[in-house]
């Protein structure tokens, strides 16, 4: 469900049409995107837009109840992983709802992206900077 105003019309539309438990993926510039998935390609150059900025913008619009990340993200890119977890904790506090965080192997993560309504590609070049958000409800 949408919460606010997002300038990117494709991303805004996808969020507005999400039902409870539907998923979207926000990924780095290198994650393979399945041909059958809707691709929202925001990448301009390396690092623009960043993964974290894209997550922040998405969270202003999307109510989430679950997060899936690759296990490798914690060990290979711990600083960015911690930034993401800080944003998730802030989102939990703001919406007063629990958000489940699940870790799966990266190869399994890539397969799981096929379930996403859309995959949002950023310009991020940090390894494993990918997240799947599961839509919640605002009530």
UniProtKB/Swiss-Prot annotation:
<dbReference type="GO" id="GO:0062193">
    <property type="term" value="F:D-ribose pyranase activity"/>
</dbReference>
<dbReference type="GO" id="GO:0016872">
    <property type="term" value="F:intramolecular lyase activity"/>
</dbReference>
<comment type="similarity">
    <text>Belongs to the RbsD / FucU family. RbsD subfamily.</text>
</comment>
<feature type="binding site">
    <location>
        <position position="106"/>
    </location>
    <ligand>
        <name>substrate</name>
    </ligand>
</feature>
<dbReference type="GO" id="GO:0019303">
    <property type="term" value="P:D-ribose catabolic process"/>
</dbReference>
<dbReference type="Pfam" id="PF05025">
    <property type="entry name" value="RbsD_FucU"/>
</dbReference>
<feature type="binding site">
    <location>
        <begin position="128"/>
        <end position="130"/>
    </location>
    <ligand>
        <name>substrate</name>
    </ligand>
</feature>
<dbReference type="InterPro" id="IPR023064">
    <property type="entry name" value="D-ribose_pyranase"/>
</dbReference>
<protein>
    <recommendedName>
        <fullName>D-ribose pyranase</fullName>
        <ecNumber>5.4.99.62</ecNumber>
    </recommendedName>
</protein>
<dbReference type="InterPro" id="IPR007721">
    <property type="entry name" value="RbsD_FucU"/>
</dbReference>
<keyword id="KW-0963">Cytoplasm</keyword>
<keyword id="KW-0119">Carbohydrate metabolism</keyword>
<dbReference type="GO" id="GO:0005829">
    <property type="term" value="C:cytosol"/>
</dbReference>
<comment type="subunit">
    <text>Homodecamer.</text>
</comment>
<feature type="binding site">
    <location>
        <position position="28"/>
    </location>
    <ligand>
        <name>substrate</name>
    </ligand>
</feature>
<dbReference type="InterPro" id="IPR023750">
    <property type="entry name" value="RbsD-like_sf"/>
</dbReference>
<comment type="function">
    <text>Catalyzes the interconversion of beta-pyran and beta-furan forms of D-ribose.</text>
</comment>
<comment type="pathway">
    <text>Carbohydrate metabolism; D-ribose degradation; D-ribose 5-phosphate from beta-D-ribopyranose: step 1/2.</text>
</comment>
<feature type="active site" description="Proton donor">
    <location>
        <position position="20"/>
    </location>
</feature>
<keyword id="KW-0413">Isomerase</keyword>
<dbReference type="GO" id="GO:0048029">
    <property type="term" value="F:monosaccharide binding"/>
</dbReference>
């Amino acid at each position: 469900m949408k919460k606010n105003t997002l300038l990117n019309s494709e991303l805004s539309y996808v969020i507005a049409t999400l039902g409870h438990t539907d998923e979207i993926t926000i990924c780095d510039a290198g994650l393979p995107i399945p041909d059958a998935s809707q691709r929202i390609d925001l990448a301009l150059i390396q690092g623009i837009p960043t993964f974290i900025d894209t997550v922040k913008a998405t969270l202003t619009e999307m109510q989430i109840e679950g997060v899936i990340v690759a296990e490798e993200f914690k060990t290979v890119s711990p600083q960015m992983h911690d930034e993401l977890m800080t944003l998730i904790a802030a989102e939990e506090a703001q919406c007063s709802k629990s958000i489940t965080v699940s870790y799966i192997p990266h190869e399994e993560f890539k397969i799981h992206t096929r379930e996403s309504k859309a995959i949002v590609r950023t310009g991020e070049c940090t390894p494993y900077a990918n997240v799947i958000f599961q839509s919640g409800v605002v009530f």
